[in-house]
């Protein structure tokens, strides 16, 4: 995936707007991906805005985690990142415009009266309407108060959603939401509308838990006289059991998936398939996803996290990834585990990865498959291998050693041919010497076919390990 800004050939502008109160959740990552894909598909722009108006809950650690996750996934903003809290003056300016045009009002409701009104609304009564909606100000208009939106009392508000289709809301059920708190801080729905307008956002693609907000935000857009963006509310991600995704379902943060050894391209591919698809295509490149993606094709039903499908998709990307990159990632994973490594571990991994990567689903599995190549001579043989080294087997391995030492080309096909011809010349099945040879070369670690093991180890290391074992039986 390229991180360079896309040339803008359309007026489409999407945005990802996380709240920095925690890690980058895979649900948020998928939202970012859908916005990124749609912007690239249309030749538009993908922007990022940090919605940090809640200063008490927002943390720099969370901001850093979000950007680390986006960077790892390869999705960077095409313009400078916007931090919402820095736009507070602009938000208050918009509220003043609503006050001036009669679309907002000051509310001095007491805490007690507000609690009663909310309780009545929850009990099925009318949506919250402040008695100050049409009342003159109190004797002391400077007393603490909030500013509320003055929404319509009747009629309906239509959200023509790109995913859900037309959704109609009864205005009588939409309360007069607070725009500015008593301390002058703007609220979410107000800030979102102002920022999306000022950033030129044309398509708001987000989780369908925001669908109700779309109606309220539509009314604010209309009151401000601004052009509405297109809304697309995508389904949430559920666990394999259909329940809301939670810790009991396993990893949730993008960083956790990275630590578990998934590749960014594998996770991107998998997340794209959660709620969207292109026919029967399961595995595809970024270029194909960009070509095929349209938010209108996102399904309405919640997607379920499927670990087996994720592992399969990631394995397909791992199998075609560049060997040098995989070797570097494997080395980092081993270092993070604190595993003792030989000085030439990078070279050993580079030689081993091509031979074992097809059997791995993640970088962590790849590290396990490479373990045999990182062992330092002399290897400690398992009891099973020692028991296999009978006098007959040792003599046979000595004859094999002589042929291996004379093979002119040390390669996969050459070693495969040699092993087959040796078994034929000995008049025995492979089982008479193969298991013991495997144990000698790997020390009992998981490993691929013998010709791949020896190709990964190279001539000198393979013969050295065999010589060590034969010498121990001398």
UniProtKB/Swiss-Prot annotation:
Protein localization = Cytoplasm
Q: Which CDD domains match?
A: GluRS_core
* Matches recorded under Pfam families: Anticodon_2 (PF19269), tRNA-synt_1c (PF00749)
Q: What processes does the entry annotate via GO biological process terms?
A: glutamyl-tRNA aminoacylation
Question: Which GO terms of the molecular function aspect are on file?
Answer: ATP binding; glutamate-tRNA ligase activity; tRNA binding; zinc ion binding
Keywords from the named record: Aminoacyl-tRNA synthetase, ATP-binding, Cytoplasm, Ligase, Nucleotide-binding, Protein biosynthesis
Record-linked InterPro entries: aa-tRNA-synth_I_cd-bd, aa-tRNA-synth_I_codon-bd_sub2, aa-tRNA-synth_I_CS, aa_tRNA-synth_I_cd-bd_sf, Glu-tRNA-ligase_bac/mito, Glu/Gln-tRNA-synth, Glu/Gln-tRNA-synth_Ib_cat-dom, GluQ/Sye
Q: What is its EC number?
A: 6.1.1.17
**Record's GO cellular component, any one?**
cytosol
List where the motif 'HIGH' region lies: 18-28
Reaction(s) this enzyme catalyzes, per UniProt: tRNA(Glu) + L-glutamate + ATP = L-glutamyl-tRNA(Glu) + AMP + diphosphate
Q: Which domain of life is it from?
A: Bacteria
Q: Give the location of motif 'KMSKS' region in residue numbers.
A: 244-248
Stored Gene3D superfamilies: 1.10.10.350, HUPs
What residues bind ATP, as annotated? 247
Instruction: List the PANTHER family.
Output: GLUTAMATE--TRNA LIGASE, GLUTAMATE--TRNA LIGASE, MITOCHONDRIAL-RELATED
- What family is reported? Belongs to the class-I aminoacyl-tRNA synthetase family. Glutamate--tRNA ligase type 1 subfamily.
Protein function = Catalyzes the attachment of glutamate to tRNA(Glu) in a two-step reaction: glutamate is first activated by ATP to form Glu-AMP and then transferred to the acceptor end of tRNA(Glu).
Q: How does it assemble?
A: Monomer.
The name this protein carries in UniProt is Glutamate--tRNA ligase
Specify the species: Caulobacter sp. (strain K31)
The opening ranks of the lineage are: Bacteria, Pseudomonadati, Pseudomonadota, Alphaproteobacteria, Caulobacterales
